[in-house]
Each structure stands twice: as C-alpha cells, then as structure tokens.
C-alpha cells in the first residue's frame, strides 16, 4: 500500500510534462531537443566541467544527440531536468531535482549557468529560488539539499542568497564538498 501511494504521487507529478515555472529573471522549462546544442557545448567546456566535478565530454555531437533524444523520451519519476531560459528566450543553463525520496521527504538539486555572460547577475539565485518554490508548493518534500565544491565560492554565495545553509563538509571522489540544505519551515513558514 505504501509503495502504491508513492507511485501515485509521482504519476501525478508527471502528468504535466511540459510545465514552465516563472521566476523573476528566468523561466524553468522542461528540457527539449532545442536545448541539446547548448548542453553539448557546456558539457564539453573544461571550466564548466571542473565546476561540476566532472570530466568534459569527449564524444561527437551526433553521438550526444542520440543519447539526448533517448533521455527526452524516457523521463524519470524520481527526477526532473529543466532548461533555464531568460524572458527574451535565451537558454542560459540547466537545473534539476533528483533522488526524490517520498519516505524521507527530501530531494537533491543541481544547477549550472552554462552561458558565462550571465554569471554574477542573479540568474543562478533566481533559478534556485524558483525551483525551491516549485518543489515546496507542488510536492510533500520538506528538505532540499545539494553538494557544491568547497572552493566554488560563487555557487556557495548563490545558494546562501537563495536561503540554503551550510550543514557540513563531505569528501566525495577525493574532493571536498559543502552539503547545504533548505527546509520547508525555513523557506516558507506559512506553508507547513
């Protein structure tokens, strides 16, 4: 019975795949094929890969595109990926939630502003705030958390600005990360 209740919640969450969520500076929209080229360019960028603690992709765009198309067809029920788009229609980055846990009432999030001309302009903070508001208003999640590289001061400042607090340092893959979280009671005390 418990698993049916959880699965039912997730099926309801997936009914409206083509949602868009408006922030003050950005719109979070479901990923589409039109976002593939930017995603490829950002995932092959050395600096962006370092900030995401990954290796740059070393495959051809055509190969990437085939995988991308398959990912768009098979959307998961425990995660969702969004394109971050400005109000003038420019795709500047991506964010997502994943590892949605309806038992612990928590999920992890991630973000990347891939277009570097939009760094240090509040687009990342607005994207995070918009995603937080969406999650707390449409799910039963009480805790949203993330891991960011300790040396990535820009990201940490953006997360703090969005209401996250630093919880502890953790080592993952040989790198030091800061675990940060925001709780529903802190983010929206009137929405308990």
Language-model segments: residues:
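A short helix-loop-beta-strand connector motif used in the catalytic cores of GNAT acetyltransferases and
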Residues: 70-83
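Short amphipathic alpha-helix that is part of the acyltransferase structural core
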Residues: 32-52
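Alpha-helical elements of Rossmann-like donor-binding domains used by nucleotide-donor carbohydrate transfer enzymes
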Residues: 38, 63-70, 126, 130
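A short linear boundary/processing microfeature
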Residues: 45-46, 54, 161, 165
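Conserved GNAT-fold acetyl-CoA-binding loop/helix
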Residues: 47-69
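Acyl-donor (CoA/ACP) binding surface of acyl/acetyltransferases
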Residues: 1-36, 81, 86-192
């Amino acid at each position: 019975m418990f698993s049916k209740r959880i699965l039912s919640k997730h099926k309801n969450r997936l009914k409206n795949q083509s949602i868009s969520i408006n922030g003050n500076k950005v719109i979070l929209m479901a990923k589409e094929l039109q976002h593939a080229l930017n995603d490829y360019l950002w995932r092959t960028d050395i600096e962006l890969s370092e900030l995401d603690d990954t290796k740059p992709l070393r495959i051809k765009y055509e190969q990437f595109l085939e995988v991308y198309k398959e990912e768009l067809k098979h959307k998961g029920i425990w995660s969702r990926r969004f394109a971050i788009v400005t109000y003038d229609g420019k795709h500047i980055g991506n964010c997502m939630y994943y590892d949605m846990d309806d038992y612990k009432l928590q999920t992890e999030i991630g973000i990347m502003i891939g277009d570097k001309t939009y760094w240090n302009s509040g687009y990342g903070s607005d994207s995070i705030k918009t995603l937080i508001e969406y999650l707390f208003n449409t799910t039963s999640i009480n805790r949203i958390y993330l891991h960011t590289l300790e040396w990535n001061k820009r990201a940490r400042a953006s997360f703090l600005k969005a209401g996250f607090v630093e919880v502890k340092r953790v080592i993952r893959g040989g790198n030091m990360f800061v675990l940060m979280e925001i709780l529903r009671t802190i983010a929206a005390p009137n929405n308990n």
